[in-house]
Amino acid sequence: KMHKSYHERNLTCQQGWGIMELADQTDQSMGIPFLTRNSEIMAAGGVVGILILMVMPLPPFLLDLLLSFNITFALTILLVGTYLLKPLDFSSFPSILLIATLFRLSLNIASTRIILLHGSEGPAAAGNVIKAFGNFVVGGNYVVGAIVFMVLVIINLMVITKGSGRIGEVAARFTLDAMPGKQMSIDADLNAGFIGEEEAKARRKEISREADFYGAMDGASKFVKGDAIAGVIITLINLVGGLAIGVLQNGMDIADAAQTYTLLTVGDGLVTQIPALMISTAAGIVVSRAGSQSTLGREVLSQILRQPKAIGIASAVLFGFALVPGLPAVPFLALSMIAGGVAYTVIKSKKAEQKKSEEREVIEEKTRPRERLESTPLVDILALEVGY
């Protein structure tokens, strides 16, 4: 009976801990009541809506809205990644990466449809967002736009995606290799009484979640790589198909068709490749935050300012560049003055802090009570008499 009562209390305690943990996660992640009540419906509706975009023709204003939302969503994910303390704070990132990739490909299909069907009507036929990226971003020069698009694809595919995928692969491998040692350490702390049963369960669960997360990120990086390759193929299809439709079906001149469809195709490629670059950067930031103790900006700034001598040497080197004939003196002098001012301020603050700590130690030494010989208690003499 006593064993059953203890088992019931333990089960009730575990359920209470689970409910409290779920409530804390809900309170921390969702502060808006509407999103809290309808989060599952919104997620399912979003996925279904993404699939509908692949087969449903969109008007230009709705395509503008969705393209703007894609840029906003990618920027939000990137900023969330910079404020993470540890990767498990964003454990849903692999699923978000898959959904974002699918959404971006759906927008590519929708924009391809509208470019091929209505591209002969002019640059505004595919919406104002694609027109703006085709005209304003690349100055209306489709050759420059094509070069910029290919550069972005190479950066995304060969640099960021490859690097983040390698980080995720290595992190997953080392996390799995370190799991037995971490489990033994938790068991040793539990047996020694340093931690309780609930804390041991929480640590084991966190280790398992960490291994699952890095394994999922290792696979999710392939989505980004495939998305970049698909973006290049879709761009080529838009260009070749647009030229064929414009010249053969709509009777356009070859030069006009090349300028119109190339401008629309490059604008479409840029408006989808820039969010892809943001998501890839966010993936690299998230998987590289394994041993961090603070946010990205605070951690980088504190670690750089920890070495003011290096900043001072960089200031001297920049000043030397300013004296080289042919190099612009004003930018190098300005950067040299800024770096020198930062180094001087950091060194001065460190010296002031060191002086305060020394003064504090002197004051503590003076106020510390000293032991005196007079205050030593007297020892009673003990005598033992044997016999008479």
Model-derived regions: residue spans:
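Non-transmembrane accessory domains of multi-pass membrane transporters/channels
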Residues: 190-194, 348-388
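Gly/Lys-enriched N-terminal cap/neck module of very large, oligomeric protein machines
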Residues: 21-139, 168
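Hydrophobic alpha-helical transmembrane segments
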Residues: 40-47, 51, 55-71, 91-101, ...
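Membrane-interface segments at loop-to-transmembrane junctions
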Residues: 29-38, 67-68, 85-103, 129-140, ...
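Short, positively charged and aromatic/hydrophobic N-terminal segments
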Residues: 1-10, 14, 19
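Transmembrane helix-loop junctions at the membrane interface of multipass transporters and ion channels
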Residues: 51-64, 82-88, 111-143, 249-256, ...
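Conserved glycine-bearing catalytic or ligand-binding loops at nucleotide- and phosphate-handling centers
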Residues: 179-182, 276, 283-284, 329-360
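Membrane-spanning helices that line or support transport/gating and their immediate boundary helices
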Residues: 62-65, 109, 113, 162-174, ...
